[in-house]
A protein has these predicted regions:
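Terminal catalytic/cofactor-binding subdomain
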Residues: 1-52, 61, 86-97, 111, ...
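Gly/Pro-rich turn-and-neighbor structural signature
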Residues: 17, 21-86, 117-145
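Long intrinsically disordered, low-complexity regions that are acidic and Ser/Thr-rich
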Residues: 76-177
Length: 494
């Protein structure tokens, strides 16, 4: 497991270890929630502090969950085109690294010069604690820099690598993930039906999914240019621009046909059924895309527009056109994919048992969604406590029609509270539903990483070297450490 925290924004991000099955992912997600709850309870009064597994913050930023899958970037002629594109990018990449090194060096000299001048001015005075020390300033190569200097350095780098990012974006759009975009985009447009967490906007309108409602591209970069693509390729961009500048190892890894790609349209939910359907159905669709040549797929006229439409359609009545003018509703699209994958699995005698369990759960969920009363006034009660957006909508609909927005918004927020007082947990206690993941599985996941994944090797390395004077630095793909003056690098292959 990994994580990060920005205490200035009260934001904690936590990640599951690499896993081999959808059930395993959900199990470690639930283990993460319990670990956070235990950490909070042991350090802060539970009546004064709480954790919210939210999809937005007080500043209006949309958060949600990012899922990472190993996908084949391209194959056949498209893979050759991908390689050629990467080779053509090498010269501008090297030029960028040279110019960027000069730029960072000049920023470092500027910082040292300013500090030297300030030091001369204060030699005749009694030394006073400085504000721009390591506790309040960022560092470049270990040297402290004032915030304005760091901002200037970062702004310059962004302008220097902007042409490379633009060229790499063209390569992605032209070559990368073509089968996935063609055959799976309609599924992702409708997926919020299964895994949306619900959202109440500032006008008291209820959305199925906050994250999916902001999708504006099929493929691209998210953090770099503030786009909200379905296929988020920021990890590839980081490899292209990765430091240290004298090494091309990360660049060379882009030639591998299998890359880690993020799907960035999912909400942060709590229902086990929602989470298992999200990961399980997505994994099946991606495998189906890469292993079949089925031409009978839905190709929507505008994928991003359809995704936004379905994300705001809690009554499940909106339809969107495909390229041939045929209209589809979200539940109809989901059924088409369900039938296609079920037919594909029928031809595979080696299909794992979990695949069929996901198919059964998927089909049951769609059948229960279809049981919505004709007046469209209430969500299906059978899915309350099992699908997040339906559960939250049901809670809000129990209020009087004249209830003020702030009371409804309180339900929207406290539904995600990770405590016994959270509204989801209270709902679960009331309904007494049988969990899909047992407490025994979750307890084990809190202590032991998956035995057949890089997380196992990473965890063993941390345990062995955490007490030694090894200067251990651990990342997702590799770790570096020193023993008896000898430097070592361990790589965690997936």
């Amino acid at each position: 497991m990994g994580g990060s925290a920005d205490l200035s924004k009260a934001l904690i991000e936590i990640a599951t270890p690499e896993s081999r099955s959808p059930r395993q992912v959900v199990c470690y997600e639930l283990a993460n929630e319990r670990l956070l709850q235990e950490a909070l309870a042991s350090n802060h009064p539970v009546d004064q502090w709480s954790l919210i597994k939210s999809n937005s913050d007080a500043y209006g930023h949309t958060l949600g969950q990012h899922e990472s899958y190993d996908m084949r970037v391209a194959q056949g002629p498209l893979l050759i085109a991908w390689w050629i594109g990467l080779i053509l990018l090498l010269l501008p990449l090297l030029l960028y690294r040279v110019v960027a090194s000069i730029w960072l060096g000049s920023m470092l000299l500027l910082s040292l010069g300013i500090r030297k001048i300030e030091g001369i001015r204060t030699t005749s005075k009694t030394p006073q604690p400085r504000v721009d020390d390591l506790h309040s300033a960022d560092c470049l190569l270990g040297f402290p820099m004032a915030p304005w200097q760091w901002s200037l350095a970062a702004s310059g780098l962004r302008r220097l690598h902007a042409p490379i990012v633009w060229l790499f974006g063209l390569l992605l759009n032209a070559v990368a993930l073509r089968p996935h975009r063609k055959k799976a985009s309609a599924f992702f447009a409708s997926r919020c039906l299964l895994d949306g967490a619900g959202h109440l906007d500032s006008d008291a309108r209820f959305w199925v999914s906050a994250r999916a409602a902001l999708v504006d591209k099929q493929i691209g970069f998210g953090s770099y240019n503030q786009h909200r693509p379905i296929f988020r390729c920021d990890s590839l961009l980081r490899k292209l621009l990765a430091s240290p500048y004298w090494s091309l190892n990360q660049y060379a890894s882009l030639f591998n046909p299998i890359q880690r790609i993020e799907i960035a349209i999912g909400d942060s939910g709590l229902c086990q059924q929602s989470q298992w359907l999200r990961i399980g159905a997505t994994a099946l669709v991606l495998d189906w895309v890469e292993q079949t040549d089925d031409p009978n797929t839905i190709q929507l006229k505008s994928v991003s527009e359809a995704t936004r439409e379905f994300a705001r359609d809690w009554m499940l009545i909106r339809s969107v056109p495909d390229r041939f003018g045929t209209d589809f509703r979200a539940r109809e699209i989901s059924r088409v994919y369900l039938r296609s994958i079920k037919s594909w699995l029928d031809k595979r005698p080696d299909a794992p048992r979990e695949a069929w369990e996901i198919i059964e759960l998927w089909q049951m969920t769609l059948n229960q969604i279809d049981s919505i009363p004709k007046n469209q006034g209430q969500p299906p009660m059978l899915l309350v406590g099992r699908i997040d957006w339906i559960s939250k909508l049901w809670l809000i609909q129990q209020l009087d029609e004249n209830t003020v927005w702030s009371v409804k918004k309180k339900i929207d927020i406290r539904y995600h509270e990770l405590s016994d007082q959270g509204y989801y947990q209270q709902l679960l206690d009331k309904l007494q539903l049988s969990p899909l993941i047992t407490d025994r599985e979750i307890d084990k996941a809190m202590r032991v990483p998956p035995s057949d994944s890089p997380a196992w090797r990473r965890g063993n390395l941390i345990r062995e070297l955490s007490d030694a004077q090894s200067s251990l630095v651990v990342g997702w793909e590799s770790a570096s450490y020193e023993l008896e003056g000898q430097a070592y690098v361990a790589r965690f292959l997936r």
